[in-house]
Amino acid sequence: GEIINDVVTFWGIELINTQLYSYVLACSFLIVIILSPMLSGIADVSGRKLQLMKIFCLAGSLGCLGLYAFDPSHMEWSMSALFLANIGFWGSLGFYNAFLPQIAPANEHDKLSATGFAMGYIGSVLLLLLCLALIMLVGSFMTPWTFVLVGIWWFSWAQPAFRKLPSTPTKLPTQGRLIAQGFKELRKVARDLSGRKELVRFLWGFFI
């Protein structure tokens, strides 16, 4: 296949490809870190946890589909798709984990969580093997189609959870109350972090 140079151009700026990749991931993680506490507070008030998880899942799937059009000469689009896919994955995972107390008693949390992760890893390995087989046996031109497969696989296997997980939407509070609840959760996280210097140093090191 085509060999991509180590240096790529992104919005007119030349960067090492791995450097750009790290920057995009770090920015997407930062967005998730800021949004998650706010959205979890909004979800608690509105009862729309499942709806928010669907939005993130759809965004992540669309990001994967967008990587089909990955083009080294147009890194802006390619990195935008990666950015969206990463936000979709980590954003939906937060709501996914929040459902555990609603679907199982406390003494079954560990078992159910381990089972869920095991099934997820099995599914991802099966898809990985399929994608590798397409690339190695059919040809490298199938590489873009593997991103399409990932997007479809992700969204398709999310449907059983979307149908079965409890959803208890309530009448939406005023916009002001929703925003206030979101910032309240964000302040709570900030206060919690202020007492954990090691974690703060780790986060600074991660993003820098």
PLM regions: where:
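Pair of pore-lining "gating" transmembrane helices in MFS-fold secondary transporters
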Residues: G1-D6, F83, K197-I208
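Central cavity-lining transmembrane alpha-helices of secondary-active solute carriers
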Residues: T18-G41
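C-terminal ends and interior cores of transmembrane alpha-helices
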Residues: I33, K54-S73
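Cytoplasmic membrane-interface "Motif A"-like loop-to-helix N-cap segments
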Residues: A43-C57
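Hydrophobic core of transmembrane alpha-helices in multi-pass small-molecule transporters
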Residues: C57, G63, H74-S92
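Glycine-rich segments within core transmembrane alpha-helices of 12-TM secondary carriers
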Residues: K111-L134
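C-terminal membrane-cytosol helix-exit motif in multi-pass small-molecule transporters
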Residues: L127-M136, I152-T170
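Juxtamembrane intracellular "pre-TM" segments in multi-pass secondary transporters
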Residues: P166-W204
